[in-house]
Design a protein with these regions (language model features):
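P-loop NTPase Walker A phosphate-binding motif
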Residues: 74-98
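An N-terminal, helix-rich hydrophobic module
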Residues: 1-29
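Conserved adenine-nucleotide phosphate-binding loops and their immediately adjacent elements
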Residues: 19-61
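Conserved NTP-binding/hydrolysis module of P-loop NTPases
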Residues: 109-125, 139
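A conserved switch/coupling segment of P-loop NTPase cores
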Residues: 61-65, 87-95, 131-186
């Protein structure tokens, strides 16, 4: 403290805001505390969201009433940004964990579940499929899973989301896509 020019009893400014996400370790035991070690891995916007409060409120209402919500629209209309804001609001309001999965660069449709497992820090094994490992990791804990840019992997996203929702009672999925996922009951 003296080297920083601060008196010995001075509080350290804002250090805790930087550490939680950078200190996150990948989960090795899907049943354990790593899920509770942090609240989210959401991207941080560079600027505030302006003029979209109506859409944001509607998304919040949809998330309150449904376990799977897909934000659809043409490219560039702000689906991703709205998803970030809606997920941020939800993690701030509720005691849930949120996992962001960016799918835009995914080239292999068969790798969707593996990409989600990786984002959650879940390690697949030869004897356990990715969806099974993810479901075991999430369990009955309240989790919001955000799948961004699903349009080029709609079918595998829909399949995985349906299977996870059937296994995880407190899981909610928010997806962004140029077309609906088409999961029954959505």
């Amino acid at each position: 403290m003296a080297l920083a020019g601060l008196p010995p009893a001075a509080p350290l400014p804002c250090w805790t805001e930087v550490c939680p996400l950078s200190a996150r370790e990948p989960a090795t035991d899907p049943s354990g505390p790593p899920l509770d070690a942090y609240r989210h891995n959401l991207p941080r916007p560079m600027s505030p969201l302006i003029g979209r409060s109506g859409e944001l409120a509607a998304i919040g209402a949809c998330l309150d009433a449904n376990r799977l919500v897909t934000l659809t629209g043409a490219g560039g209309v702000g689906k991703t940004r709205l998803a970030v804001e809606a997920a941020t609001e939800r993690t701030s309001r509720d005691a849930i964990r949120c996992f962001w999965v960016e799918l835009a660069t995914l080239r292999n449709p068969d790798a969707v579940a593996s990409a989600v497992a990786s984002a959650l820090g879940v390690r697949e094994t030869a004897s356990e499929a990715a969806v099974t490992a993810i479901a075991r990791f999430v369990g009955d804990r309240p989790v919001l899973l955000v799948l961004d840019n699903c349009e080029h992997v709609v079918a595998p996203c829909a399949d995985m989301a349906g299977r996870l929702l059937a296994r995880c009672a407190n899981l909610t999925v928010l997806a962004t896509s140029r077309e609906p996922l088409g999961v029954p009951g959505k």
